[in-house]
């Protein structure tokens, strides 16, 4: 059975299963954001110290994305996905059992290894498995899976953690991954590696100034976002003085707004990707500047979160579109680099938020995050003027 002869129904089932896998991988990366206070309590540690777990995870993904992608470039993709899921599930069992914080961090490193490879191959696999002429929709489904991790995965993970303990959240993610693995084994055909690129692709990509500029923009804007977002749960409870339940609601609003951002980008992204990204970054700057003033009431924080969620989703989707358009000849290498760079930003933001919370005041995380966000806004305007044509999305062939 090949990808060319299967029915459209089976082809879509394969893409949907990949989207569910994307949902699970993104949920586990972000779910600690909603569990920091609970994990800190169980290990009798300050919340800001537990937050270093976010930085370690993100930087392991950043460092290992490209090396692991190159090491596995010749491995048949179905077998590779199965191996990734086995590592992913085993690491979640270890998270569930973690008897101290060090063991929890080790388990998260195992998950990060699986994550590093998964995100470097997923976009190209979705395109290969999609029904004819439906490549853009397949990528959109993967993006939806990613968005739903913020909308449903993170808040549900937090609710489970609130009522049953954070260990149960990690165990439940492992069970979800096991079910997805069974579906992948049943649905996926053999998928020989193709168009994955190699080390030879790197000098070629590094000689593309427009692409390098997008990578730089990505790391700066993601650092800005995660400086505040990584600590939003303790911020709501300790700075704003609001309830743990409202922290859950706020995460739900932030994620739900991401779906609106996804719809907006889906409608306008093909024609207006560049101005949309700049407008979204400007919106991010405003939201970060207003984070502390908005902490005076639940309604103000809720409204701010809607605009924040829309902005970060448009930014994330826009960056992916730019990278894929600028590196159609080495998508796996380009996306592995993108995943790595995105995670450098996550780790840097979480680290900055950690240091600000420990040595200054958690109340200022919005103001501190707004500084790189403003730099990103200026840089986006410069590069979209410098490369107006080459940065637009190339048409699907």
From Swiss-Prot:
Where does the UniProt annotation locate this protein?
A: Cell inner membrane
As for family, the record states: Belongs to the major facilitator superfamily. SotB (TC 2.A.1.2) family.
Identify the InterPro entries for this entry: MFS, MFS_dom, MFS_Efflux_Transporters, MFS_trans_sf, Sugar_effux_transptr_put
Q: What is this protein called?
A: Probable sugar efflux transporter
Query: Which keywords does UniProt give here?
Result: Cell inner membrane, Cell membrane, Membrane, Sugar transport, Transmembrane, Transmembrane helix, Transport
Species of origin = Citrobacter koseri (strain ATCC BAA-895 / CDC 4225-83 / SGSC4696)
Molecular function terms in GO for this entry? carbohydrate transmembrane transporter activity
Q: What is its main location?
A: membrane
Q: Which residues form a coiled coil?
A: none
Pfam families linked: MFS_1 (PF07690)
Superkingdom of origin: Bacteria
For this protein, the parts annotated as crossing the membrane are: 15-35, 50-70, 81-101, 103-123, 136-156, 169-189, 209-229, 246-266, 275-295, 301-321, 333-353, 364-384
Q: Which GO terms describe its cellular component?
A: plasma membrane
Q: What does this protein do?
A: Involved in the efflux of sugars. The physiological role may be the reduction of the intracellular concentration of toxic sugars or sugar metabolites.
Topology of this chain in the membrane: Multi-pass membrane protein
């Amino acid at each position: 059975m090949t990808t060319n002869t299967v029915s459209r129904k089976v082809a879509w089932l394969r893409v949907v299963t990949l989207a569910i896998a994307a949902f699970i991988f993104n949920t586990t990366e972000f779910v600690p954001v909603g569990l920091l206070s609970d994990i800190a309590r169980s290990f009798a540690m300050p919340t800001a110290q537990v937050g270093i777990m976010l930085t370690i995870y993100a930087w392991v993904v950043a460092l290992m994305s490209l090396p692991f992608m190159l090491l596995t470039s010749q491995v048949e993709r179905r077998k590779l996905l199965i191996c990734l899921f086995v590592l992913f599930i085993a690491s979640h069992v270890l998270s569930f059992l973690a008897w101290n914080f060090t063991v929890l961090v080790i388990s998260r490193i195992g998950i990060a290894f699986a994550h590093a490879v998964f995100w470097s191959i997923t976009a190209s696999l979705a395109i290969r498995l999609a029904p004819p002429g439906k490549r853009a929709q397949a990528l959109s489904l993967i993006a939806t899976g990613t968005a739903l991790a913020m909308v449903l995965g993170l808040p549900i993970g937090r609710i489970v953690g609130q009522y049953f303990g954070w260990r149960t959240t990690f165990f439940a993610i492992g069970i979800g991954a096991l079910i997805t693995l069974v579906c992948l084994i049943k649905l996926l055909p053999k998928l020989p590696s193709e168009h994955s690129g190699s080390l030879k692709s790197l000098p070629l990509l590094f000689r593309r100034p427009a692409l390098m500029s997008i990578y730089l923009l990505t790391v700066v804007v993601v650092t800005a976002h995660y400086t505040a977002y990584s600590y939003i749960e303790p911020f709501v409870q300790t700075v704003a003085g609001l309830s743990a339940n409202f922290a859950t609601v706020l995460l739900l609003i932030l994620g739900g707004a991401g779906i609106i951002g996804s719809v907006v980008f889906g409608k306008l992204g093909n024609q207006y990707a560049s101005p949309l990204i700049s407008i979204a970054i400007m919106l991010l700057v405003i939201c970060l500047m207003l984070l502390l003033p908005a902490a005076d009431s639940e309604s103000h924080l809720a409204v701010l979160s809607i605009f924040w969620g829309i902005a970060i989703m448009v930014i994330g989707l826009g960056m992916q579109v730019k990278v894929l358009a600028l590196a159609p000849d080495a998508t796996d290498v380009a996306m592995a680099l993108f995943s790595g760079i995105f995670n450098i930003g996550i780790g840097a933001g979480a680290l900055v938020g950690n240091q600000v919370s420990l040595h200054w005041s958690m109340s200022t995380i919005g103001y501190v995050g707004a500084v790189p966000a403003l730099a990103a806004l200026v840089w986006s305007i410069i590069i979209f003027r410098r490369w107006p044509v080459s940065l637009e999305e190339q048409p699907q062939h």
